[in-house]
Amino acid sequence: MAAQGEPQVQFKLVLVGDGGTGKTTFVKRHLTGEFEKKYVATLGVEVHPLVFHTNRGPIKFNVWDTAGQEKFGGLRDGYYIQAQCAIIMFDVTSRVTYKNVPNWHRDLVRVCENIPIVLCGNKVDIKDRKVKAKSIVFHRKKNLQYYDISAKSNYNFEKPFLWLARKLIGDPNLEFVAMPALAPPEVVMDPALAAQYEHDLEVAQTTALPDEDDDL
């Protein structure tokens, strides 16, 4: 039996992407998850239990964060095994981190077939954006969901989790009924910039995909 108030619905979520893209910053925004995280020494991983309250009851994502070991090459299969969903993160101010997204996707689906995956472009609060909406096409080719996010400003923090929860529960009408306590914003996302980026993404969605054979 789950303890009183303990979510019975939980999912293993793996968070992958190049080092320095903001994965740890992102997961640490959720304050109770940061407070209750556990370190798995055998895999060199921190597991953050992120609880979200929905109209279908509480849902917990046990978010596996690599603690930086991706800087030394790929991750071991033990990190991916039994993952039920994933977030792949890149940094919109660094083109190389987007170029590496197909490698992360390949490693992930080699171990975890057919799990829901969200692609997130982080650091959209920074004015010097290099990876624009029109060049982010990988998710369309692989049937992933995409969101612009800004971990430091909390912009769109909940979006990847809501999309994954709807997929995993099988209810497109699932909603979060309360937002989790998040760390105060370290930067402010310019509302005009956010509106522009949302418009750019809508336009990009309706643009034909390029014909080239490579993965990006």
UniProtKB/Swiss-Prot annotation:
GO terms for biological process: actin cytoskeleton organization; cell division; cellular response to mineralocorticoid stimulus; DNA metabolic process; GTP metabolic process; hippocampus development; mitotic cell cycle; mitotic sister chromatid segregation. There is a cross-link at K71 (Glycyl lysine isopeptide (Lys-Gly) (interchain with G-Cter in ubiquitin)). Residues 211-216 are annotated as: Interaction with RANBP1. GTP binds at residues 18-25, 36-42, 68, 122-125, 150-152. Its main location: nucleus. The record marks Q69 as: Essential for GTP hydrolysis. One of its GO terms (cellular component) is nucleolus. Pfam families: Ras. The modification N6-acetyllysine is found at K37, K60, K71, K99, K134, K159. Mg(2+) interacts primarily with the phosphate groups of the bound guanine nucleotide. It comes from the Eukaryota. It catalyses: GTP + H2O = GDP + phosphate + H(+). It is found in: Nucleus; Nucleus envelope; Cytoplasm, Cytosol; Cytoplasm. Expressed in a variety of tissues. Changing K134R: Loss of normal mitotic chromosome segregation and formation of sister chromatid bridges. The modification N-acetylalanine is found at A2. NCBIfam families: small_GTP. Belongs to the small GTPase superfamily. Ran family. This is GTP-binding nuclear protein Ran. It comes from Homo sapiens. The lineage of its organism: Eukaryota, Metazoa, Chordata, Craniata, Vertebrata. The gene is RAN.
